[in-house]
Amino acid sequence: FIKSKVNFKNINSYLDVGTTEDEHHESSNYLNKRFDFIKKHNSISDQKIKNNRFSNILQKTITGNFSQNEIDTLRSDFVISNATIEHVGSFDNQEKMIDNMIKLSNKIIVIQTINRFFPIETHTKLPFLHFLPKKIHRIILKILGYKYYSLEENLNLLSYYEMRNILKKFENKIDYKIYR
């Protein structure tokens, strides 16, 4: 899908936000494995990444503060986050993540996440429960034994409208399009 929407002709560097250390699943770092035509790959992750595909790796949360040196080292033409924004915690942290991605981008930012109102929640595989108000959803997840996912800091799904509202705050910095 991304290759059909983005012109990669002048993309020379790539930044993967939220890289996982897990390389055992086909979905792990899926996009990074498919962008081998881009010369320089960079990574930001709160995990320790041992992967020789990356030119630069910064072990840091994407919601943190970045020094000018870190920004200069990691700034890339194409910055992508695949299934990360729902794991950074609060709405404020989600905003901070996007703000940092803008600072780290020369040209293009892609944020991929599951829509909160997709019928099956992909982390728990439970249908429709996540349609409930977030507070009730979290209580039920905890009762069902999904304590990790019941905490906002570990899972905070966004609806189309919530994502749009975050992006509207950056209209003076970026042009954006949301695909459903």
Residue ranges and their predicted role:
Residues F8-K9, K103-L104, K169-K173:
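Alpha-helix C-cap/termination motif
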Residues Y149-E171:
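Short alpha-helix
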Residues K5, N12-F118:
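Conserved SAM-binding loop
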Residues I108-I136:
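Conserved class I S-adenosyl-L-methionine
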Residues H123-P127, K134-E153:
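Short, glycine-/aromatic-enriched active-site segment of Class I SAM-dependent methyltransferases
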Residues F1:
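Conserved SAM-binding loop and adjacent beta-strand
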Residues N172-R180:
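Conserved S-adenosyl-L-methionine
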